[in-house]
């Protein structure tokens, strides 16, 4: 068994199929062409191919310093899987097994699992013999090797004997106990390259080590003709893309369900979402009382904010109030007000989503705080307590006039901030909504992260927040696991949140309101990637109503189970101090949902194309492997027999020999007819005669 091992080529497809034959799942091998480019996904180890004879000479020139890094401690050596190569032509399998058996995250399968447990605690020599005594490994190795010719070819004069004596060798680089090791089956012990830095990945350490090694090897006398090959053992790309594709399809279904729910409510209430047809600051004839809507209280920040009121024409019924008076008529369609910080990165400061029925019961503002609250020009724009305090301020003014200058002046008197005057035309211009625009939110590039629907305003536990991730869906690579809870918070990097506030003095319950929010839960250092939850409050799906004495401030989705204090109170204090909460939600309009759906569809198409490419690549690996391992002797013998039976073989042989003779004659004639040489000879002879005459 130990005498029949064949040589293997350095090909990523061959090693990938060899891994599958070993019974290992979720692993593939990729070739590395550029050391400076990062590798997507987790890297389990590296396999390095070099010309062994030249490598040995170059290391001998450098000096015996490499021997100082040998690990001779038996406990350390026997604890890892390091086997000496005792079988010829088995270095490729040795290097691959050294990576697979030293990585606990890999699913090894029955064959390698049995080998790993059987050789536990053995020395390198015993492990080397154990590899040769596993018939499954030997069969898998030889099944991907090129068959040896039965008859040795005639000696070719064009190949030197020195070149034929050179051999190539495989070694592996793995990590064990936070240290980088080089495992060479021809060495007696592993080579320890030491730990890597605290703030770097182990692949950066390997990049420096392998670059230094290649530099030392190419610095020799014959180093220019040394050929290297580097391969990385990574996670299976097909499984990664399949997982990502399933997540994207789940997110698409969630968004579709959200749109169906929004559409169902809109059908019942005759609410229509359409393109912007008219933009005005104060709609004539339809101005509500200030104590019934906090939107107009926000207009006191008009000196620094741009407000676009998107209004759709519908009938305007009168709405009775609880105190017997009548509220000024409002349109029975959806009216949304977007108040945006002028020139601040495209982040929405305040966003109100107001859904009105033919009988208005409640107007619920949703607040979005700025992304960075430590900037002076933003902290002055945020009220200390938007919910209850803004209601008192709005109630203090009896009516809201139709002049934006009056609203801004009242804001300056309240907060002590003297705003610069703005022309009303700047707000009333029909293109104001286009200038403000439906700004691209930072979450729209993360469609590949999990979404989930929560119906109702009940206390729903959510993962603790942490730093914001700005990776797009296409840059995530292999990180698709669920978010991990973390207590780490970031005071500098926060994202906006939608909040639903019930104002005091309103004895009526909340109206049937559907609120679509995207909740982002962020992980801390060492945790998983951020995830998103799509929260939908639907009255038809057991939406919890708020009583007359209830007041929900902040994000109701962020309230943890229990008393509801703790993090919520800390976040509220931070909000009162001019800060923003780190764990927040985004308010969605149907247009936003449609844009999100479009982005998810685009990501699905990209992911499907990548998955298709990986599947085609795997098929190509199998085709190349069949071409490599197929024995063509029987086919060639049968073809020559058929030619001989038809009398064509002798003619082809004579024709081939004749062509070779003609080529030889023509080459000889060309060598004899060298005109430049004759001219030189004539010139030399004439010079000799001239000298003699002189």
Swiss-Prot record:
Entry's localization field: Cytoplasm; Nucleus
GO MF annotation: an example: cysteine-type deubiquitinase activity
Biased composition (Polar residues): 465-487
Residues at the site labelled Transition state stabilizer: 85
Record EC number: 3.4.19.12
Membrane-spanning intervals of the chain: none
GO cellular component, one term: cytoplasm
Low complexity bias spans: 396-412
A Pfam family assignment: Peptidase_C12
Keyword Acetylation appears in the UniProt entry: no
Reactions the enzyme catalyzes: Thiol-dependent hydrolysis of ester, thioester, amide, peptide and isopeptide bonds formed by the C-terminal Gly of ubiquitin (a 76-residue protein attached to proteins as an intracellular targeting signal)
Region (Disordered): 392-427, 454-487, 665-694
Similarity section: Belongs to the peptidase C12 family. BAP1 subfamily.
Protein name (Swiss-Prot/TrEMBL): Ubiquitin carboxyl-terminal hydrolase BAP1
């Amino acid at each position: 068994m130990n005498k029949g091992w064949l040589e293997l080529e350095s090909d990523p497809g061959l090693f990938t199929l060899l891994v599958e034959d070993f019974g290992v799942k979720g692993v593939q091998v990729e070739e590395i062409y550029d050391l400076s480019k990062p590798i997507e996904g987790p890297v389990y180890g590296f396999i390095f191919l070099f010309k062994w004879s030249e490598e040995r000479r170059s290391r001998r020139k450098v000096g015996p310093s490499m021997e100082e890094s040998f690990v001779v401690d038996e406990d350390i050596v026997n604890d890892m899987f390091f086997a000496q190569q005792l079988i010829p032509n088995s270095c490729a399998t040795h290097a691959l097994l050294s990576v697979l058996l030293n990585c606990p995250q890999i699913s090894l399968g029955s064959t390698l699992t049995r080998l790993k447990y059987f050789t536990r605690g053995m020395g390198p020599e015993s492990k080397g013999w154990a590899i040769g005594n596993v018939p499954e490994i030997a069969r898998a190795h030889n099944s991907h090797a090129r068959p040896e010719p039965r008859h040795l070819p005639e000696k070719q004069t064009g190949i030197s004997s020195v070149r034929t004596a050179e051999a190539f060798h495989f070694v592996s680089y793995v990590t064990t106990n936070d240290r980088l090791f080089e495992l060479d089956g021809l060495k007696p012990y592993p080579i320890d390259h030491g730990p890597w830095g605290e703030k770097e990945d182990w692949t950066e350490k390997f990049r420096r080590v392998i670059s230094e090694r290649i530099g030392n090897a190419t610095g020799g006398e014959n180093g220019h003709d040394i050929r290297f090959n580097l391969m990385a053992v990574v996670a299976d790309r097909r499984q990664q893309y399949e997982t990502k594709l399933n997540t994207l399809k789940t997110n698409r279904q969630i968004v579709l369900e959200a749109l169906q729910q929004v559409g169902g409510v809109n059908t019942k209430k005759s609410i229509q979402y359409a393109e912007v047809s008219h933009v005005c600051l104060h709609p004539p004839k339809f101005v509500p009382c200030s104590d019934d809507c906090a939107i107009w209280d926000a207009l006191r920040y008009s000196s620094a904010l741009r407000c676009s009121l998107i209004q759709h024409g519908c009938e305007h019924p009168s709405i009775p109030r609880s105190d017997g008076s009548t509220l000024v008529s409002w349109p029975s369609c959806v009216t949304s007000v977007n108040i945006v910080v002028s020139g601040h990165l495209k982040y929405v400061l305040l966003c109100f989503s107001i859904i009105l029925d033919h009988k208005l019961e409640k107007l619920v503002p949703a607040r979005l705080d700025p992304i960075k609250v430590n900037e002076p020009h933003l902290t002055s724009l945020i009220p200390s307590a938007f919910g209850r305090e803004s209601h008192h301020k709005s109630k203090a003014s009896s009516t809201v006039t139709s002049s934006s200058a009056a609203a801004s002046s009242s804001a300056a008197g309240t907060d002590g901030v003297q705003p610069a005057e703005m022309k009303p035309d700047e707000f009333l211009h029909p293109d104001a909504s286009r200038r403000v625009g439906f700004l691209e939110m930072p979450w729209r590039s993360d469609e590949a992260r999990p979404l989930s629907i929560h119906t109702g305003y009940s206390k729903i536990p959510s993962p603790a927040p942490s730093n914001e991730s700005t990776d797009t869906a296409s840059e995530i690579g292999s990180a698709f696991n669920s978010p991990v809870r973390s207590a780490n918070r970031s005071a500098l990097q926060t994202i906006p949140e939608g909040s639903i506030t019930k104002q005091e003095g309103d004895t009526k319950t909340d109206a049937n309101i559907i609120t679509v929010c995207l909740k982002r839960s962020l992980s801390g250092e060492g945790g998983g990637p951020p995830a998103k939850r799509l929260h939908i409050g639907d009255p038809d799906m057991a939406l919890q109503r708020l009583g007359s004495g209830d007041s929900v401030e902040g994000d109701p989705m962020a309230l943890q189970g229990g008393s509801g204090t703790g993090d919520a109170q800390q976040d509220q204090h931070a909000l009162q101090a001019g800060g923003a909460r780190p764990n927040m939600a985004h308010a969605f309009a149907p247009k936003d949902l449609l844009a999100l759906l479009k982005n998810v569809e685009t990501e699905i198409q990209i992911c499907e194309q990548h998955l298709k490419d990986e599947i085609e690549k795997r098929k190509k690996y199998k085709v190349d492997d069949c071409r490599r391992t197929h024995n063509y002797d029987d086919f060639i013998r049968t073809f020559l027999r058929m030619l001989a039976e038809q009398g064509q073989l002798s003619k082809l042989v004579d024709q081939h020999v004749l062509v070779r003779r003609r080529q030889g004659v023509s080459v000889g004639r060309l060598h004899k007819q060298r005109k430049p040489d004759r001219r030189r000879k004539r010139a030399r002879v004439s010079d000799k005669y001239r000298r003699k005459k002189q």
